[in-house]
């Protein structure tokens, strides 16, 4: 230790000697070069890998030199808070929660036991649109959302215009409605048909009814019907399929019966639009606009505020990536951005009136959300293949320039998100597409800022240089020499070996062509 201190104390005197300075430089260069060699050899990386193997994993990983795999998770706790939501506990108990912080909810139960005495009930037929709200007793008259929810559920479950059984409403019990599912007909075939219709309506209402009533069948014998082009299948050895006799709706308090799912809210809202829209698709006049919270143009892109994402902060997405939402409508991320932007800007003039918000969103969600994407993901969920729940999205980010791809939905399988290795081909393709897009954009930018005449001049000058370089390497003969004679310059000999000035006056001497003197 004393030698080291003495070395640093005598450092000024040492530097005074030129030889010592040279030795110090050589030592520093050797040490730095040795460290670089050790790093390039991979020895340090091997030790780091052995120490951290199985103990540490990074949530982000590099793709090549500059591209990084990243993700974002949307937070829906404050989104669509003015709309009811639904969830399912099992195949018999389902719940609808009121909007915001309200305490009321509606319990939907499938059972084989009746809870209403028909002699003390008021019959309300399904064909009458508004009579279902007469079943709501002792409920705050100002709470129109419950009546809206009841009407939506009623129209979705009991399709108007068909021969369906009446419903029973219990008096003096707040909300208690009973659907008799066995009164449609005595024949089992028609009851099964009605049961399938009911399940279809419930699945559209609840959204997440993947395996609540349906499972799989080991055999399905199908054959064409006589005098018809229809195919009839007889399923056997089926598991998990059952029917119930009664459907009960009753009011309840919300006690976190099950986990909230924002997709169920979207399904619920879109189920009511189905009563007025025959087909649902994105309208041609709707385009994605890049704007900030005040509605002004936002050339830099679109930013999700702190309330819209899981982690605290603001996440911005570039104009180049977000603008792709105008090119096609096959991105779940674009649909979520439209919903967030609509929720933040379009309803400010409604003075936070939940019913007005709900009515407006119900009428416009048809143009905000792609029903084709919802249907595709619902079919994927039913078929037990990875599907999108519109919550977590991944994208490729270029750490050098900040450019990134349009976020893609992180698919779910068996209740959990897929591992990154399961869709490796997809994010590698996105990375290559980002490289291609950046190179193309850089090429177009350079082409736009460079005059075409300058490009032509550069091309022809380069061609001229290559040609002259070839001529320089080959060389051309410049004058004649007399064999075995000195250079006759500045005289210029003819093929006979003479010069007109008379200096070389004897003709007939042999001559040869030579190149210019170097």
Curated annotation (Swiss-Prot):
GO terms for molecular function: metal ion binding. One of its GO terms (cellular component) is virion membrane. Keywords: Disulfide bond, Fusion of virus membrane with host endosomal membrane, Fusion of virus membrane with host membrane, Glycoprotein, Host cell membrane, Host endoplasmic reticulum, Host Golgi apparatus, Host membrane, Host-virus interaction, Lipoprotein, Membrane, Metal-binding, Myristate, Transmembrane, Transmembrane helix, Viral attachment to host cell, Viral envelope protein, Viral penetration into host cytoplasm, Virion, Virus endocytosis by host, Virus entry into host cell, Zinc. The record marks 58-59, 283-284 as: Cleavage. Residues 34-58, 478-518 are cytoplasmic. A lipid is attached at residue 2 (N-myristoyl glycine). GO terms for biological process: fusion of virus membrane with host endosome membrane; receptor-mediated endocytosis of virus by host cell; virion attachment to host cell. Glycans are attached at residues 90, 112, 127, 180, 251, 389, 397, 414, 419. HAMAP family: ARENA_GPC. This is Pre-glycoprotein polyprotein GP complex. It comes from Oliveros mammarenavirus (isolate Mouse/Argentina/RIID 3229/1990).
């Amino acid at each position: 230790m004393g030698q080291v201190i003495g070395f640093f104390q005598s450092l000024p005197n040492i530097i005074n000697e030129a030889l010592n300075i040279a030795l110090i430089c050589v030592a520093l260069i050797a040490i730095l070069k040795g460290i670089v060699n050790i790093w390039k050899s991979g020895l340090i990386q091997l030790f780091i890998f052995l120490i951290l193997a199985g103990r540490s994993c990074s949530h982000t990983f590099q793709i090549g030199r500059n591209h990084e795999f990243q993700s974002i998770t949307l937070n829906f706790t404050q989104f669509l808070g003015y709309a009811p939501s639904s969830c399912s506990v099992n195949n018999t108990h389902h719940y609808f929660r009121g909007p915001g912080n309200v305490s009321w909810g509606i319990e939907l139960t499938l059972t084989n036991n009746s809870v209403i005495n028909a002699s003390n009930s008021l019959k309300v037929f399904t064909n009458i649109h508004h009579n279902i709200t007469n079943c709501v007793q002792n409920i705050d008259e100002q709470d129109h959302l419950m009546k809206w929810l009841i009407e939506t559920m009623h129209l979705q479950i009991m399709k108007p215009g068909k021969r369906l059984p009446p419903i029973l409403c219990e008096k003096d019990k707040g909300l208690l409605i009973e659907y008799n599912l066995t009164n449609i007909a005595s024949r089992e075939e028609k009851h099964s048909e009605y049961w399938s219709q009911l399940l279809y309506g419930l699945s559209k209402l609840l959204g997440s009814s993947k395996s609540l009533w349906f499972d799989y069948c080991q055999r399905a014998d199908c054959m064409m019907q006589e005098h018809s082009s229809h195919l009839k299948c007889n399923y056997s050895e089926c598991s998990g399929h059952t029917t119930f006799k009664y459907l009960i709706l009753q009011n309840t308090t919300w006690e976190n019966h099950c986990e909230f799912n924002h997709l169920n809210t979207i399904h619920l809202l879109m189920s009511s639009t189905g009563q007025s829209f025959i087909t649902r698709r994105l309208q041609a006049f709707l385009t994605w606009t890049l704007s900030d919270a005040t509605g002004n143009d936002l050339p830099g892109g679109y930013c999700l505020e702190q309330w819209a994402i899981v982690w605290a902060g603001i996440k911005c997405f570039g104009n180049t990536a977000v603008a792709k939402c105008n090119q096609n409508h096959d991105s779940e991320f674009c649909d979520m951005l439209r919903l967030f932007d609509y929720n933040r800007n379009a309803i400010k003039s409604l003075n936070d009136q939940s019913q007005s918000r709900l009515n407006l969103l119900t009428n416009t969600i048809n143009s905000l959300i792609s029903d084709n994407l919802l249907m595709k993901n619902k079919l994927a969920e039913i078929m037990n293949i990875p599907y999108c729940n519109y919550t977590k999205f991944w994208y490729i980010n270029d750490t050098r320039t900040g450019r990134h791809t349009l976020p893609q939905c992180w698919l779910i399988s068996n209740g959990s998100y897929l591992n990154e290795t399961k869709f490796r081909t997809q994010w590698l393709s996105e990375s290559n597409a980002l490289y291609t897009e950046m190179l193309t954009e850089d090429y177009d930018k350079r082409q736009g800022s460079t005059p075409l005449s300058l490009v032509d001049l550069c091309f022809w000058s380069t061609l001229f240089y290559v040609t002259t370089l070839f001529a320089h390497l080959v060389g051309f003969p410049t004058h004649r020499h007399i064999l075995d004679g000195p250079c006759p310059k500045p005289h210029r000999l003819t093929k006979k070996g003479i010069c007109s000035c008379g200096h070389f006056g004897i003709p007939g001497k042999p001559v040869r062509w030579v190149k210019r003197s170097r």
